[in-house]
């Protein structure tokens, strides 16, 4: 069922970027620049749509069969908090002159979404999110108020608990524009469990560069994680599951020919003396016709083989994809006394893709301690660790694209159960044996990431208007990437210049064996910051205020 509509404010102005969700699910869309939306939902009753946008009251609308829904959203008159966090300071919102947007993490949680950057879509004005790949676990590209290449890329700066965090792999200019590589490795917060986040502040104007320099040319996203509270221990368990349906030939949007229709088309093209492209792989009906004209088979054999092709109806989607179930678990405990407060959590994510064999496993751990050592001295410690493994097929294999573009008349298996190969053209001179199942079984891309981050802080309260802050952070990240092609694959045959099992020519670059590429990155960073903060109110009814900070910071990576 398709539902369309428009979202406006009380002044009848359209609202782009509004998140529209089917209540109780992760199924949703975002309104376009005209404020319009178009969402397809399964048959269910009742149908309740949830509309949300930063600065507006969340609204629920029950669908009763309207042809076009009109939703008017009202402004949220209450502020999230009386303060905002910039990473260096906590500022009274009433005194704020910068463009800063603040949201609570609990307000943007979407079931089944395991990345906080994806949850920000439609919730932060001037923030644009794009994904260049449909693969599981890929990192979207974030853009805040346009783009800049002043610092070599266009990504915003991430700050967690006052510390700038870097990507797990420092990228050079050769790979910055490679979406297959950049999207898969994850960004600076890929190892952070969204369930551990308390709030998010987004800095978008010159105030960001004042604090962080040229690194903030593309904006700053400040994340504050959860802390302990005074009281008895509170244990929480959160679990989300998602279901991803694989493509099927019966889907309305997949209008592809069956084997009989494809062979009939080939007959029409042959009767019209159609000239095929020189780089086309000759397979199926065209291959049999070529064999017939060459005298390799007779008319009777030709008719028998064509009949087999008409009855193949290979279900490539069933062979290469599967319905996928994913799940996410977080167990946390928090509590404490006036002197010591704590928050700790462990998390596990298993995110499976519809492409068989693709998926992500991730483990996270978090510990936060806060202690009032004296009336004038407070100490805190935040520790975060993560381990993840990502398994993908080689991007050159392209299972989903292959299923969409390959004739169903082509068989995946021989009658005896062995793989069925055809000659795939490499260039005008060479053709080698190809079967996509052989490519998948003998190639892979595997990425393993791990790391930990430790932040310690001392806060000195000299007076009620003057305090000092000393912060130390140490972080380690490891990234291992492995790409493999076996010697029996078409990919290696093109390098070897011969089919598997056939002697390679003397000028072959790879006469035997396969291809293995490994990239290992180890990154260690530390930073030390000392800061003095002044926030003094004076005068009648404390109408006047002096606010400032003086600090020194050093870092290394």
Q: Locations of the language-model features?
A:
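Surface-exposed loop/interface segments of Gram-negative outer-membrane beta-barrel transport/assembly proteins
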Residues: 154-155, 160, 171, 229-312, ...
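Short, small/polar-rich motifs associated with maturation and membrane association
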Residues: 1-366, 373, 378-380
């Amino acid at each position: 069922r398709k539902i369309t509509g428009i979202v406006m404010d009380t002044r009848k102005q359209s609202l782009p970027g509004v998140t529209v969700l089917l209540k109780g699910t992760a199924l949703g869309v975002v309104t376009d620049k005209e404020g319009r939306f178009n969402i397809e939902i399964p048959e269910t009753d009742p149908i309740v749509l949830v509309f949300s946008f930063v600065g507006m009251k969340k609204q629920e609308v029950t669908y009763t069969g309207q042809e076009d829904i009109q939703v008017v959203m009202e402004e949220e008159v209450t502020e999230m908090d009386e303060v905002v966090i910039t990473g260096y300071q906590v500022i009274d919102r009433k005194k704020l002159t910068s463009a800063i947007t603040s949201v609570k993490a609990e307000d943007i949680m979407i079931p089944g979404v395991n990345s906080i950057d994806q949850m920000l879509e439609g919730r932060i004005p001037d923030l644009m999110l794009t994904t260049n790949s449909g693969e599981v676990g890929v990192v979207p590209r974030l853009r805040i108020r346009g783009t800049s290449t002043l610092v070599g890329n266009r990504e915003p700066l991430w700050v967690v608990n006052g510390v700038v965090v870097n990507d797990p792999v420092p990228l050079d200019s050769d790979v910055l524009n490679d979406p297959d590589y950049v999207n898969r490795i994850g960004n600076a917060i890929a190892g952070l469990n969204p369930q551990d986040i308390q709030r998010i502040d987004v800095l978008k104007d010159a105030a960001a560069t004042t604090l962080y320099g040229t690194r903030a040319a593309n904006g700053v996203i400040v994340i504050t994680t959860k802390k302990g509270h005074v009281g008895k221990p509170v244990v929480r368990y959160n679990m989300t599951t998602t279901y991803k349906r694989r493509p099927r030939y019966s889907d309305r949007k997949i209008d592809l020919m069956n084997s009989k229709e494809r062979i009939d088309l080939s007959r029409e093209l042959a009767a019209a003396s159609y000239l095929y492209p020189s780089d086309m792989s000759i397979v199926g009906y065209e291959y049999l016709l070529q064999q017939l004209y060459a005298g390799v088979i007779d008319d009777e054999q030709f008719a028998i083989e064509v009949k087999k092709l008409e009855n193949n109806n290979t279900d490539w989607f069933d062979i290469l994809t599967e319905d996928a179930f994913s799940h996410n678990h977080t167990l946390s405990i928090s509590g404490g006394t006036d002197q010591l407060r704590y928050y700790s959590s462990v998390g596990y994510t298993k995110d499976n893709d519809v492409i068989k064999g693709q998926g992500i496993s991730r483990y996270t751990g978090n510990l936060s301690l806060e202690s009032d050592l004296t009336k004038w001295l407070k100490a805190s410690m935040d520790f975060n660790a993560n381990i993840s493994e990502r398994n993908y097929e080689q991007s050159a294999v392209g299972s989903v694209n292959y299923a969409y573009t390959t004739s169903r008349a082509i068989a995946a298996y021989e009658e005896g159960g062995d793989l069925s190969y055809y000659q795939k053209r490499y260039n005008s001179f060479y053709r080698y044996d190809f079967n996509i199942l052989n490519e998948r079984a003998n190639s892979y891309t595997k990425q393993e990431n791990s790391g930990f981050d430790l932040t310690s802080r001392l806060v000195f309260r000299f007076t009620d208007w003057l305090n000092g802050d000393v912060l130390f952070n140490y972080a380690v990240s490891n990234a291992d990437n492995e790409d493999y092609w076996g010697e029996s694959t078409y990919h290696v045959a093109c390098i070897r210049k011969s089919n598997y099992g056939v002697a390679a020519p003397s000028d072959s670059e790879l006469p035997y064996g396969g291809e293995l590429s490994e990239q290992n990155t180890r990154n260690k960073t530390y930073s030390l910051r000392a800061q003095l903060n002044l926030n003094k109110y004076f005068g009648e009814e404390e109408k006047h205020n002096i606010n400032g900070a003086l600090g020194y910071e050093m870092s290394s990576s």
